Structure formats: C-alpha cells, structure tokens
Amino acid sequence: MSRGLGDVYKRQYPIGTIFVINTKAGRFPKEVEQMEKVKVSHIERREFDHGATRDMGMQMSKAEIVVFMTQDAVPADEYVIGNLVKVLEEDEMTGAAYARQLAASDCNYIEKYTRKFNYPENSRIKSKEDLQEMGIKTFFCSNVCAAYKRNIYEKAGGFCKKTIFNEDMILAGHMINAGYKVAYVAEARVIHSHNYTGMQQFHRNFDMAVSQAEHPEVFEGIKSESEGIKLVKQTAAHLVKRRKIHLVPKLVYQSGCKYIGYRMGKMYKKLPDKVVKWCSICLLYTSPSPRDMRRSR
C-alpha cells in the first residue's frame, strides 16, 4: 500500500485528498496515516462490502471526479490519473474511465497473456451501440484503477449498497443502459496481476455469475460465455505458437474451474445454502453468503 500511495504522489495531475478505507486486520502502516493529504478510515472486516464501502469513499470526497484504486495496484508512471481524467473531461457523456492493467514481474505465463487479452494496447470508448459486437465486455470496467464523474455516478445510481462482487461492471452497465459511455484508457497503466489457483478462479467466477444473476436489469439477454471461449482458444494457440505446450493442461484445468464456477453461480438460487457458501469467495472474508445478501434486501 505504501508503495502504491507513494507512486500516486509522483503524478502530473493535481490531487485533492486521498481517502484510504482500511479493514481492521493486522498492523496498519503508520507512515500511510502520516502522509500529506491522506485521510484514513478504519472499518471492521464484517462491514466491508464491495459496493457500499466504495460508495462510502465517494461520499467522503467532494470532488467532481473521483479515482478508485485497490491497495495492490501500483501506477506504472506518473501519468495514470491525468490520462483517466483527460478522457472524462473530453466527453461530457463519458461517466467512467478505467486503466490498463500490466502483469507484475512474478506473474505466471498464462496470466500474462490473459492481461494482454483483457487489457489491450488500444483504448476504446464503449456505449450502448457496442453491445451487439462486444456483448458483456461492453460493461467491463475495473475498480483496480478507475475514475468516475460524480454527476453521472449519481444519475446511474452509484455503486450497489449490497453486492457480493462486480460492483464496477454493474455500475458501468447502468451507465451504458442510461445512454452514457465507459472508457478503457490504455495510456493509463497500473501494475496489477494475480497468480490464482484453479479453485480461486472457481470461487471468483462463481461470485461474478451470482452478481450477474442478481442484476438482470443489466445482464439479462447479454451474451457472455463467448468471450471466455475466445480467451481459451487464443491462449491455447499462443501457447502452442510459443512452444509452451506443457502449459496447455494447466490452461484446460483453470478454464474448467472458471466455467464450472460461472455456471454454478448463474443457478445459485437453486443450490442448497451449504453449497452456495462453499462456492462463494465470501467465506474468505467472512461476509454474508450470496443467499444471505439476497434475503437482506
């Protein structure tokens, strides 16, 4: 976290205040609380919610443009924030802009290719007109590093106050369906990647599908699985071309975990409570299960 915040200071765009919302777990670095323009709020882990906690940060700020970053994202250069803001300022209908994610040096080979697939070199501004061509990827947005215009954020309803996952795509979907645009800014770059196991991929994709099932107003009728199939085919071809055939079984295994998790998440309402809780990554941070969250609404 200290490294990421330190790099945020090395920017070409003036920053007002940096709000840090920390879940109480272990020692919090004092040097962060002592940084200039940094305000730290501590919450209990059980209070954390992907949507509500980020909305809390939005309400803390009074800025017209608010940038969200996760603690494990590191700016690749000093231009990341300026590049995001520039796109928002150039078009009054663009409500969100998210950064390109580059693989870290310790990232495994398959994940490096996945980063390039999901975060290509060319920028793109997405609108409702792109749904036919891009399908669900039209709504893709990542709060690992993303900027939002406050006025459009509020008109689109803001982040869901109760969501298991995927708060960024849900909001992006609401924006696009309301006639606004979402920008992918390849010039705004952060270093961020994970070496997830197959089971971790299963849990993440289960929760992703649950979030989509919970928001039919955004995702119903939107083609989604074709993009995953395209990724698998292109990755396999890349591995063969690069003579990394020994990695193909790993790709097949991880892709299978993703697909099974996704399919089970789509039908989670039909599954027993114990199965739902086992499938959800919520157990990793002791949040309510997807079914509990649905009942609390």
Where is each model-derived feature located?
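Conserved donor NDP-sugar-binding/catalytic core segment of glycosyltransferases
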Residues: 79-111
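Single conserved hydrophobic/aromatic residue that forms the stacking wall/gate
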Residues: 1-9, 285-297
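Glycine-rich, basic loop-to-helix element that forms the pyrophosphate-binding segment
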Residues: 44-61
